Amino acid sequence: MAPWPPKGLVPAMLWGLSLFLNLPGPIWLQPSPPPQSSPPPQPHPCHTCRGLVDSFNKGLERTIRDNFGGGNTAWEEENLSKYKDSETRLVEVLEGVCSKSDFECHRLLELSEELVESWWFHKQQEAPDLFQWLCSDSLKLCCPAGTFGPSCLPCPGGTERPCGGYGQCEGEGTRGGSGHCDCQAGYGGEACGQCGLGYFEAERNASHLVCSACFGPCARCSGPEESNCLQCKKGWALHHLKCVDIDECGTEGANCGADQFCVNTEGSYECRDCAKACLGCMGAGPGRCKKCSPGYQQVGSKCLDVDECETEVCPGENKQCENTEGGYRCICAEGYKQMEGICVKEQIPESAGFFSEMTEDELVVLQQMFFGIIICALATLAAKGDLVFTAIFIGAVAAMTGYWLSERSDRVLEGFIKGR
């Protein structure tokens, strides 16, 4: 790691220049690497195989369309019979089956290319469905529709209408999954053949079931009206065929903390925090306190803040009291600041000059740089033959020489005295 810059103007300038010339630059200026994102989920092998077959079938359509259709029917029929099942066509189709970025498709095609060739030349007459022959029967990656799992078991509800047509059989068509039915809203049961909680049978026949919603708080009902409730949801009680809200705040059902109060809601309740002034409360605000918190006092029916600053609570010179909600704090008076537990008068700092932090050696270097620039400029003008600038140049050189000699003699004398 590069060192931090030294103090002082000139050393800092030289440090920055050295960093600029000594590449690469300081490492803290390099951008941090982007956060690592989790890899996307891999598709089920059956889905990859289905995609490969779908792309293969599209390739068959494309090759027929691209190679024939010129209008000469007799010529097309003669040549189509040769091209239809040719190796040339197979190669053309396979070249476009997988996109460049679909790694899973390329991997599966590499593993199954010999099987595809076998089907193309020997099996497609007896097994025209490539998906069934390749993905289900040969590779055993997929199952027929309405079945699931390693043994291709029927989904609940049967293979014709898995999950009764009102849900999704988990793993259907693949060699995985549990076969569990994920039912649509309003439907339930093992094969989604019943109405779920909060719904009733509006219509049913041998092949059709319609489930409609009960009235809001009803868990079970015989119809859509409030009076059709048979059982109520949690937080409600059945009373004269209607569901009535239970006030949990008036029962032991509410479980709020010591510094909270209960608020009843439809079918439930909420616990809300007491006011800061309260130690326990029966409702919102400082007027519903059971007891007052420290720093508060009972005034009428409310717990109000005690102004501790009315008494002498901040001993010490130049201190003053500041009242806060439920307490107070001692601060230094204006024009004073805290230092080691006492308040001392603030010293207004003198305004620092531009060169106030530079050392004597740094000032000498800066002066020499400045005079050097001036002399170079004057020398350039004097070289053009201007007598005025020539005189100024000679005078500046003489002045600089005298100044430098006097400064050097003072330093030599000072060093001699100090024994350097």
UniProtKB/Swiss-Prot annotation:
FU repeats (start-end): 208-256, 268-315
Membrane topology note: Multi-pass membrane protein
Protein purpose: Protein disulfide isomerase. Promotes the localization of acetylcholine receptors (AChRs) to the plasma membrane.
Name of the protein: Protein disulfide isomerase CRELD1
One of the record's GO cellular component terms: membrane
Impact upon substituting residue 192 to Y: In JELANS; pathogenic
Tissue: Highly expressed in fetal lung, liver, kidney, adult heart, brain and skeletal muscle. Weakly expressed in placenta, fetal brain, and adult lung, liver, kidney and pancreas.
Impact when changing residue 329 to C: In AVSD2; associated with disease susceptibility
EGF-like domain segment(s): 153-193, 305-344
